[in-house]
């Protein structure tokens, strides 16, 4: 069979955002209606290949060196020398997608440090319903084979259907990355390829937390337990989690890079992700012993301590029970006592498939809300609470807790409202090839004081955070994809502030909120409005004679200034203010000033118009100096936000992002001329809108001529 190369169509920028919003409104992104990743439709592509007698070749993730990686697995790396891309049908006469159902032994790690992902896949095989959500039925290398397969993954709040071809990296006739123990099953290798595709390359999968894989296969939320500080009923929590079908993983922390994947005396691997696949209590010499079953994704290197495959403890267990539990083959799976587990391992991750009864004994439906947000330099990336001058500009979200938990759950404890916050940064693995990795992220929770409770959604300002301490916060700021914490707080209103640790670190994020009882949530943002002064009415007689003489000297005998003359006048005046950092006013900015002030439409400013403009600029200069807090002659982007409000404008965070992009320098400084240009532009646009909004409903309708007139000449 020949190969058919099918190139996907990409949408970018505003077009992509509009399409995404429309898709959500149509219900796309839920598991039963997954979004076609990169617009690739599995059925359409498969049918096309079958009709043309060709095998699918995916140009969105082509079989080329760049798909392997960018550094350690980059095109010039010795590790990728000799790698070829082949289909399973070229390797075996009778390859299989899945044989007798997916099992944990189908997943053996190859030459890639993605044990965290493989541990998650291994846990996935314990639940057929979950597995077949991720690995759809009906795929094979026999009936209807066209070299194309598909998988469904949860990506930052949406389910996506990811198409891949079956060209896999091969070296010396063997799969380079994940493979099955028998060597003839390929579902796990193709799932790994789909995951590599959404993250940009195979190398992007190196190193991570099992919780990432858990969540991307389920859409669930992960809880972390540091085993040195674990609750006394952790074993019961594990049993309940396994009963619910939750996915569990664990690892041993390392103290230095040299410890990475070091093997302990009893054959445990440090810095390596294991999956927890079972838990059972057995009668051992008349006492009940709690056991836990683990699996190493390598498919080998197993625990050799008590309760390992060949240990003597099994001789003192009822033969029937022993045969049910005991694992004899070298497949990476083993039992150990829970006591040894607590002693040897450092961290446990439990991904709850739905946010039901987290750490609770009774299962009930939790309420869920998801928000998307961004951190942008100069506008919404304020850093953590250690940076009080900028912390307040971070995105803010309000939670209203009304109902307390049922008393059955907590006995005599003080009543409160339980909820989980989970902050996840987006697309960081995909951006590794550009030198960007996980940012250090976290969040703080503030109680809204009674005098501010119930007010409309207003972004809280710097003074609030200077005067109020956080009521709760994430357990730590850490450079993981997601930070999640469970809280119990009294009823009331709270504000959540997600942030990076340092200011000016850019990124996109998803904030998920899970509450046991009904709760109100909202994103806080200022409503767009302007407190514009009435347009000044002034006669020439009211203007000071000295100002008239100065204007005559600058403007000439016609007593009018053109755009060029205005630029000359303003730059001559502003150059005398040595304390200001400025490059001078541009023709474009002076044209905006003329458009704002020109009453008779001749494109020039007369004496009265110039006098009004000059008084306005003097007011802007006063505001500029007030908010140039360090007296550097320029404002920071964050200082500019306060200055704009002082000038009478309230804008939402999206507009601030646009303004900072347009009017700040690369170092995020805003000089005086750019500040004036921004305020003039804002006033012009607000006044245009006010003129057109005749019924004062905040909505205007443009025909094409009006739109062009507004955008081209405002």
Curated annotation (Swiss-Prot):
Activated by micromolar concentrations of calcium and inhibited by calpastatin. Its EC number is 3.4.22.52. Residues 55-354 form the Calpain catalytic domain. Undergoes calcium-induced successive autoproteolytic cleavages that generate a membrane-bound 78 kDa active form and an intracellular 75 kDa active form. Calpastatin reduces with high efficiency the transition from 78 kDa to 75 kDa calpain forms. Ca(2+) 2 binds at residues 316, 318, 323. Binds 4 Ca(2+) ions. The active site is at residues 115, 272, 296. It catalyses: Broad endopeptidase specificity. It is an enzyme of class 3 (hydrolase). The record marks 15-16, 27-28 as: Cleavage. Its cofactor is Ca(2+). The keyword Membrane applies. Ca(2+) 3 binds at residues 598, 600, 602, 604, 609. Residues 527-542 are annotated as: Linker. One of its GO terms (biological process) is proteolysis. GO terms for cellular component: cytosol; plasma membrane. Residues 543-713 are annotated as: Domain IV. Residues 355-526 are annotated as: Domain III. The modification Phosphothreonine is found at residue 354. Ca(2+) 1 binds at residues 109, 114. The keyword tRNA processing does not apply. Forms a heterodimer with a small (regulatory) subunit CAPNS1. Belongs to the peptidase C2 family. Calcium-regulated non-lysosomal thiol-protease which catalyzes limited proteolysis of substrates involved in cytoskeletal remodeling and signal transduction. Proteolytically cleaves CTBP1. Cleaves and activates caspase-7 (CASP7). This is Calpain-1 catalytic subunit.
